[in-house]
Amino acid sequence: MPTLYLIPTPLADGTAPQVLPPTITEVVAATDAYFVENLRTARRFITELKTGRVIDETTIHLLDKDTPQADTRKQIQELMERKRNAGVMSEAGCPGVAAPGAVVVGMAHKLGWKVVPLVGPSSILLALMASGLNGQSFVFHGYLPIDRNDRGRALRFMEKEAQQRLQTQIFMETPYRNNQLMGDIIAQCQPETRMCVVCNITAPDAFVQTKTIREWKSQLPDLHKKPTVFLLL
């Protein structure tokens, strides 16, 4: 049976040599079919690894939140018939974790493929590691509601869960709305609630700090258009 490789990609530009093990390059060199979240970034990543692989001779299928499952099912079945291995890549970080990928992995399991996750950076786990908050019990909520009232209710719910369960609450926002979310957190959460802000993780200008809401209120960072993970406890 073919193998489906789950291939992490860098979180920050120019950091591949620092954050990816040699196995990634070896697998990419030997794999000529991919399911990817973003065609442009995937092609660039494959090229930057300098494996000698010719992009025009590589099969690359788009797999984002809008991709019909019927298309993906047909594509993976065709690869299986030809006994071709495949890789899955998200735009940044680990595929299938807060990123597309789970659909094709589920299909691969049903078809009897071997599924191999490779080691690489995850912004969620790196943020949790760096936060100093509870790493034994935590939950990732993904993106919060856009509507301000709904977002406020979500924040109050997470704060209550954090207090009652002593459970770290992890979430994120589209980078251009980070500052707005930061303001909503300050407005909705209690002064002594702790929050960790992890911004541009693995980049040279990475920012990681854990403070109480009271402390954050006196000095808000500028997170506009910067990939950021938020953690509450």
Q: Which stretches of residues belong to each language-model region?
A:
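Glycine/small-residue-rich loop that forms an oxyanion/phosphate-binding "nest" at active or ligand-binding sites
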Residues: 64, 72-113
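Short active-site oxyanion
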Residues: 28-34, 112-116, 168-169
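Alpha-helix capping/helix-boundary segments
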Residues: 40-42, 93-94, 123, 177
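A contiguous loop/helix-start segment that scaffolds small-molecule binding in enzyme catalytic cores
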Residues: 2-5, 84-85, 164-233
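Short glycine-rich anion-binding loops that position phosphate/pyrophosphate groups of nucleotides
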Residues: 11-13, 91-95, 175-176, 203
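Conserved helicase motor
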Residues: 61-68, 144-148
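Class I SAM-dependent methyltransferase SAM-binding "motif I" and its flanking Rossmann-like core
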Residues: 5, 103-161
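Glycine-rich, flexible N-terminal cofactor/catalytic loop recognition
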Residues: 1-63
